[in-house]
Amino acid sequence: MLEKQNSEENIELLRAMRYCYNKSKIFYAVRISISILIPILSISIYLFNRGSTGTSNTGVWFSVIGSIWLLIAYQIEKLEGGYIEKGAKIQEKFDINLFNIRWNNVLVGNQISPEDIRDFSSKFKGDEEKLKNWYGGLSSKHFYVNVILAQRSNLMWAISLKRNFSILLFTVSVLYLFLTIAFGFFVNMSMQEYIIKILLPSMSILIYGFKTSDELKKQSNKLEALGNSIISKFDTGNLSEINASACREYQDAIFVYNRIRSILIPEWLYWLRQQKDDEKMIQINIRLTKKSNLF
C-alpha cells in the first residue's frame, strides 16, 4: 500500500486534489478579505467625517453595501464549495485506489472524469515532493489494519487543525465585537450610529466567525469519537472486526465530516503544524502497527 501511494496515477490524483482545494481557497480569501474590508472602510470614513459639520449618509450606504455583500458572499461560497466537492471526490478516489474498498456511489456520487483530473493536475504549481508518502508508519501484516490506521490519520490530523482554527476564530470574533463596542463608547457613538456604521457592515464577517467556529468544534468532536473507536479495537484486540466493510464505514464518515463539509483552514496554519502533527501521527501508527502484529 505504501509503495502504491507514490505511483504516477496516484500522485496525479493528489496534484488534482491540491489544485481544487487551492482554487477553493482563492474564493475563500476573496470572500473573507472583502468581508473584513467593508467594516474597516466604514469605520475609517466615520472617523474622517467625524469633525465635519455637515450630515453624511455614508454609514447608511455601508450598511446597504454590507447587506448586499452577504448575498454576493453566499454565491462565492457556493463556488468555493464546488471546488471543495471536486477535491473531496478526487481524494476519495486516491484512498479507494490504496484501500481496496468499493466506491460508495450513493454517498459520494459520480467520480470526477479522468479528463478533469488530468486538467486539474496539469494546473497544479506546488511542490510535488510534499505529496509523496501521504500515509506513513504503516507496516502491519494485516492489510486492513494498515487501511484503518491510515483512515485514523485522516481523522486525527483534521482534529488538530479544526480545533486550533475554531479557537482562533471564536477569540478574534469576540475580541472584534468588544473592541468595536468600546470604540463606539470612546467616540460617543449613539446606538443607532453603532448599528448602522459598524455592526451591520460587520455582519458577514461576524456570522462567518461564530458560525464557523461552532461548526469546527462539532466536527472535531465527531472526528475524535471516530478516532477513539478505532483505538478501542486495538485495546480490546478485536482486529477481526477490521475488514473491508468496516473500513468503508469509516471512509463514509471521513467523506462526510472531514471532506465534503470541510471548512477551509488557512494555508499558514496548515503548514505551521504539518511537521509536528505528521511526526506524532507516524509514531502512533508505528506503535499500533507493532501491537497489531502480535495478533
From Swiss-Prot:
Induction: Part of the CBASS operon consisting of cdnD-IK1_05631. GO terms for cellular component: plasma membrane. Signal peptide: none annotated. InterPro entries: IK1_05631-like. It is a multi-pass membrane protein. One of its GO terms (biological process) is defense response to virus. It is found in: Cell membrane. It comes from the Bacteria. Keywords: Antiviral defense, Cell membrane, Membrane, Transmembrane, Transmembrane helix. Effector protein of a CBASS antiviral system. CBASS (cyclic oligonucleotide-based antiphage signaling system) provides immunity against bacteriophage. The CD-NTase protein synthesizes cyclic nucleotides in response to infection; these serve as specific second messenger signals. The signals activate a diverse range of effectors, leading to bacterial cell death and thus abortive phage infection. A type I-B CBASS system. This is Probable CBASS effector molecule IK1_05631. The lineage of its organism: Bacteria, Bacillati, Bacillota, Bacilli, Bacillales.
